[in-house]
């Protein structure tokens, strides 16, 4: 027997009706490739910016400064002997 005869093997074409091994469906809500399945796409919501509110900026700034000042005073009181 020659070398090429020993390495020859038969390849069987898979059946057209067989869909392969069973795989469980993805979890509910998991995105799939099927565009028809699932919820329709959400409509875009248009938002309107009201601009910059100077009062809100000053309130935030003053609150941050109070926090920094308080932490600075508290830390100096705690570290002094």
From Swiss-Prot:
Induction entry: Rapidly up-regulated after pathogen exposure (e.g. avirulent and virulent Pseudomonas syringae pv. tomato) in a salicylic acid (SA) defense-signaling pathway-dependent manner. Circadian-regulation with accumulation during the light period, peaks of expression at the end of the day, and low levels during the dark period. Up-regulated by UV-C light through a SA-dependent process and in a CONSTANS- (CO) dependent manner.
The record's subcellular location field reads: Cell membrane
Membrane-traversing stretches: 56-74
> Main localization of the protein?
membrane
Domain of life (superkingdom): Eukaryota
Renumbered to this chain, region (Disordered) spans: 1-34
Whether Nucleotide-binding counts among this entry's keywords is no
Q: Which InterPro entries match?
A: CYSTM_dom
User: What membrane topology is annotated for this entry?
Assistant: Single-pass membrane protein
Q: Where is the composition biased (Polar residues)?
A: 1-22
GO term, biological process aspect, one: defense response
- What's an example GO cellular component term for this entry? plasma membrane
| Family that this chain belongs to | Belongs to the CYSTM1 family.
Function field: Modulates resistance against pathogens including oomycetes (e.g. Hyaloperonospora parasitica and Phytophthora brassicae) and fungi (e.g. Phytophthora brassicae). Controls the abscisic acid-mediated (ABA) signaling pathways. Regulator of the flowering time in response to stress (e.g. UV-C). Regulates polar lipid content; promotes phosphatidylinositol (PI) and 18:0 but prevents 18:2 and 18:3 polar lipids accumulation.
Protein name per the record:
Cysteine-rich and transmembrane domain-containing protein PCC1
Q: What is the lineage of its organism?
A: Eukaryota, Viridiplantae, Streptophyta, Embryophyta, Tracheophyta
GN (gene name): PCC1
């Amino acid at each position: 027997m020659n070398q090429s005869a020993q390495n020859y093997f038969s390849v069987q074409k898979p059946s057209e009706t067989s869909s392969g091994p069973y795989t469980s469906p993805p979890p509910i809500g998991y995105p799939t490739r099927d565009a028809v399945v699932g919820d329709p796409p959400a409509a875009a919501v248009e938002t309107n910016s009201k601009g910059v509110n100077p009062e809100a900026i000053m309130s935030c700034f003053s609150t941050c400064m109070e926090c920094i000042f308080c932490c600075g005073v508290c830390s100096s009181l705690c570290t002094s002997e």
